[in-house]
Amino acid sequence: MNESSSMSQNESKSINSTNCQRLSIGQTSKKISTNINSIIINSQDKISDVPSETSNNQKQSFTEIQGIGFIGIKDKSGNKNGFGIQKMKDGSVYKGNFLEDKYNGIGIFYYSDGDIYQGEFNNGITKGYGEYYHEKEVTYYGLWLDDIQFGIGSEIWSDNSQYFGNYNNGKKDGIGTYIWADKTMYEGEWKDNVKEGFGIYHFKNGNIYKGEFKNNIINGYGEFIWDRGKKYYGFFKNEKKDGFGIYYWSGEKFLIGFFKEDKQDGISKYICKNKIKYYRWNDGKKSKHFLNEEHFFNFFRPSEKKYEVFFK
C-alpha cells in the first residue's frame, strides 16, 4: 500500500509554488498622482502663448520641458485640457489626454525606474483597460480601478509563466488559471492571491488533483488521479490523505477506509476480485483482521458511524 502514498515531495512543493509571492502589480506599482499641479514647476519660460481661439474654445500653451514641465493644450483658465506631455520631478513622464488639469482618457505613463503603464485614465488615476510593463519581470493586461488591478486581467512573467482570471484590490481573487513555465497548471478559485476553494491542479508528470484548497494547499475533499490509473477519492489535510477515502488500484481492486497523514489508520474494507477482507490499521500497519462483516461493524467507533453505509 506504500504505492498509494499521495503526492511526491516535488509535487507538494509545486502546488505551493504558485509564484504568488512574485511581483503583484497592484501591490508594488507606484500610484499615479492625482494632483498634477503639486509636482510641476510653473515658472518655466513660455516659448509661445497663442491667444487665438480654437474650435473648442481652447488656446494652445507650450511650456518648454527642460528637466521638468508641461507642453500641450491649456484652456483660457490655464487648465490643461486636451493632449499634453507632462514631466515630473522624479523623471516620470506622462503623455496623453488631460481634462481639467488631470490625466483623463488614453495616455502613457513612463515611470522613472523604467516601468510603463499605457491605457485609460479617469480623474488622474488608472481606471478601465490598461497595460503595465514591469521592466524585465512581468506584464499585466487588463482592467484597473483606482490605480490597482480590478476585474479580468492577465499577467505574463519573464519565464513565460502566466495567469488569466479575476482580480480584486490588486490581487488574484475569484476564478483564474495559472500556468507555470514547465506547463504545470492550476484552474480554479483564488482568494487574496492564494488558491482557495475548488480547483483542478495538473502536475507536469500527468497526475491530476480535483478538489478543495485552503490557503494555497490541498485541504478538504478531493480526487487524486495518478498518471498510471490509480485513484483516490476522499479527504486531505495538508496535502496528505487524512480522513475517510477510497483508494483504487483498478476496477477490481480497491480499499475503503480511513487514513491519517497519508497512511491507513482505522477501519477498512479491502476488495480484490470479489473477495472481501476487513481490517483495522494503526499508523499504516494492520492491527486487527476481522472474521466477517458483522464482527467488523461491531468495532465501529462513534466517529466512524457516519461512514457505515459506505462499507455495506
What annotation goes with each model-predicted range?
Residues M1-K312:
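Intrinsically disordered, low-complexity repeat tracts enriched in Gly/Pro/Ser/Thr and acidic residues
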